Each structure stands twice: as structure tokens, then as C-alpha cells.
Regions:
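Class I SAM-dependent transferase core
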Residues: 1-84, 92-96, 100, 113-115, ...
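Conserved nucleotide-cofactor-binding alpha/beta core module
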Residues: 76-196
Length: 218
């Protein structure tokens, strides 16, 4: 069966993403334009636009399209802004961020995922303003600051270092808490003081090294 990906992309936006209160025109245009199927394993390509998390291996998964849409809308990356992505994954959200912002630095701890994402970005021509680094975000050291920080996997609690990478006025998206009910939040480095906005409930795999400590029952 031949899949009409253009139609599938339109259906994803109109039937999944927009009804979940994603109304930002730039975000909707990005999701309606970028080929999500090019970032999905061949075995899952028929499900590229389904309302599902898709496995990436290494205990990670690709966010549902609705979560990607809400993430991008909350962060509002602008054309003159720089983005730090923590967890490259498939490279699809990386491409979306790159389409909306000036530059994306994306950190991926798994070398296989980093290499595959780089290849997909190059093959689609969507990676010209993207740099992928095969590093652990929990130990990565940089003096650079970013307008947007996007954490694509969950954390039990938000590492202080992630917040330190924000410029004044910067925004950080992260999913925090304990499975199965986690909270997506937006940290804003406001000039009047940092603030946190609660966005929605979801459930994501944990960032490597950021899961809760095991609970021992005696």
C-alpha cells in the first residue's frame, strides 16, 4: 500500500495537533511541512503520523505529534534565537526547532542515535543550522547561554545546570516527575525573576541518569 504522506501530514495537524490547542501559525506550518516519515525507522514508517510514541531503541521513544506541537508552541523559538536541545532522539524535533530558530545545538548520549539523526538531517537538507554533539548533558560543560532549552526526555527533578544555560528571557521546556503521571512545565528566566508555567500532563521515558532513585521497601 502506498501512503500519501502529504495527506497524512495534513491529517496529523488538523485532527491531532490543532485540536490539542496548538494554534501557533509558525508551529503548525512547520509540522505541516517537515517530512516526519523521514525520521522514523522503516519498520514504523506507516505509523509516522499516528497518535503514538514510536520506539527509538536504547529505552527512548519519539514523542507523540501532539506533544511535539505543544512543546514547540510553549517554547516559541524565534528566527534570531539559539536553541539547546537535550536528547536528539530521531532528529525530527531537532529539525522542527532548526526550522523555527537561528541555530540548534543538540546533545545525544547514545552514539547510534546521534549518528542516525545526523544522517537524517543531512539527507533531508534540514540540518544546515544544527550541530549534534554525542555527549551526556548531565556532565556537558559550556559557558554558552541559549534563548531556548528543550529537554526531550523526562527528569525526576530539573538539574540546576539546565536552568543555568538560559539567557535572560530564555525558556526551558521539560517533563518532570514520576511515571505514569508527569508534568510538562516551562521555566522562564524572566527579568523580574524566574517563574514556572504548568503546561499539561504526559508520560515520557527518562533522560539517561535523570530517573528517580530506586525506592526500597522493607
Amino acid at each position: 500500500m502506498t501512503i500519501n504522506y502529504t495527506q497524512a501530514r495534513e491529517n496529523m495537524v488538523e485532527q491531532q495537533v490543532r485540536p490539542w490547542d496548538v494554534l501557533d501559525a509558525r508551529v503548525l506550518e512547520t509540522l505541516a511541512t517537515l517530512p516526519r516519515e523521514a525520521f522514523v525507522a522503516e519498520s514504523h514508517r506507516a505509523l509516522a503520523y499516528a497518535d503514538l510514541e514510536l520506539p527509538l531503541g536504547h529505552g527512548q521513544s519519539m514523542m507523540k505529534p501532539v506533544v511535539e506541537g505543544r512543546t514547540l508552541q510553549a517554547l516559541k523559538p524565534q528566527a534570531a534565537e539559539d536553541v539547546l536541545e537535550i536528547g536528539t532522539g530521531s532528529g525530527y524535533l531537532t529539525a522542527c526547532l532548526g526550522n523555527l530558530a537561528r541555530e540548534v545545538v543538540s546533545l545525544e548520549i547514545q552514539p547510534e542515535l546521534a549518528a542516525a539523526a545526523r544522517a537524517r538531517l543531512d539527507a533531508t537538507g534540514l540540518g544546515t543550522n544544527v550541530r549534534i554533539e554525542n555527549v551526556d548533558a548531565l556532565t556537558w560543560d559550556t559557558d554558552r547561554r541559549f534563548d531556548v532549552v528543550c529537554v526531550t526526555a523526562a527528569v525526576a527533578s530539573v538539574p540546576a545546570r539546565f536552568l543555568q544555560w538560559l539567557r535572560p528571557g530564555g525558556r526551558l521546556f521539560v517533563v518532570r516527575g514520576a511515571s505514569p503521571v508527569m508534568e510538562a512545565v516551562l521555566h522562564v528566566n524572566d527579568v523580574n525573576g524566574p517563574r514556572i508555567e504548568s503546561l499539561f500532563e504526559t508520560d515520557l521515558p527518562y533522560l539517561v541518569g535523570a530517573a528517580p532513585a530506586p525506592q526500597f521497601v522493607f
